UniProtKB/Swiss-Prot annotation:
Family of this protein: Belongs to the CSN12 family.
Gene Ontology annotations for the cellular component aspect, listed alphabetically: transcription export complex 2
Residue span(s) of domain PCI: 222-403
Organism: Caenorhabditis elegans
Record GO terms (molecular function): double-stranded DNA binding; RNA binding
GO biological process, alphabetically ordered: poly(A)+ mRNA export from nucleus; post-transcriptional tethering of RNA polymerase II gene DNA at nuclear periphery; transcription elongation by RNA polymerase II
Name of the featured protein: PCI domain-containing protein 2 homolog
Amino acid sequence: MPSVRSIEDYFGQIESLLYRQDWTNGEKISKFVSTYDEHAQEPFMHIEAYGSRSKRCRVSEDEVFDEIVCLHLHVLYNIHVAQDLITAQSTQIQIIQLFNKEILQKRKDENWFLPIFYRLCTDLRWLSKGAEACVSGDDEGDSNANSFFESAAKAITECYRTCVSDVHAEEGTTKKVAMLNMTNQLFQIYFQINKLNLLKPLIRAIDNCGSLYHDFLMSDKVAYNYFLGRKAMFDADLNLAEKSLLYAFRNCPADSMSNKRKILIYLIPVKMFLGHMPTSQLLHEYRLDEFQDVVAGVKDGNLAQLDGALAANEAFFIKCGIFLMLEKLRMITFRTLFKKVSQIVGTAQIPLDAFQTALRFVGVTDVDMDELECIIANLIASKKIKGYLSHQHQKLVISKMNAFPTLSGVSSN
């Protein structure tokens, strides 16, 4: 896209693009209303209330876009001059409400403008995050922060309702193709304010969208499966999490290393719970060496190594939101160690003392007999070990057939 040399040039370029209203030009125009495009950094673009001036440039081709552009300039003014992200965020909501009322609702037989709408929604999320940071030090910071995200979600949801109610079925004109992008926008907002329960009807709508799914952009499908996989992971639905995250990873472009890395941060723990350990080479390739000792500890049944790895990389795992899940790998690690003990003992009746000896050998000295019995009972209850505890004889009696079934074939809880 050519650089913007002046405010007159800015309006002129938009007007020329509006002469041909197709998806390609919609993508080009979207950059002109982005708060992160190069033009947004130019001082001559930071104009307060430009739309109220009597002498000004205009998008004469389209009055609605003229108003949107003027509001966009006001957003830029509040970001760069007034440094008022709260007003910038509320103005961005005005833009989206205007877009919904005058474009999504009234322009029935076209959808070329959806790339512009996607950009406006993405910027609204970022402005909401910025507004949140502005009030985070206030006494009522948390509630105010949530209100920014909630107002953003409300504006996007209103547009979502408009698009899903579109009766046109053809790919070239239906606004229903915006469903997935808007679902992704709302996924990110609800993750931010911890209201994932509000996503259920949106997920159900995608599940039931039929052949329309093939018309969605692959980039939106990748993002959706990434978010769906994360939600499924936190819901302890490991099979759905694995399926979704694998789809996202395999369909993410090979040169998008940072995005593939983000997907792996959640896919790796899911795979580990299902008994599939990542290779050291994979972890190194995607700069995820924080997992190296975690994986080694789980594979070797070494509780001390696992605990040490979690402690050493606690800040990273907490930032990613997976620390508590990784802590639950202790049960898998206990299982690995107990499987090794059973192989050494070589009988179906294993004294509990043998497990305690093994625990002490790997540096775990704070597990008494009662806690050991509780750990084994939980492993049996979750079907990770086939057998039963004989409290009277202080032994674990394991099944002679497949006493330690594959983790992918048992309950994930």
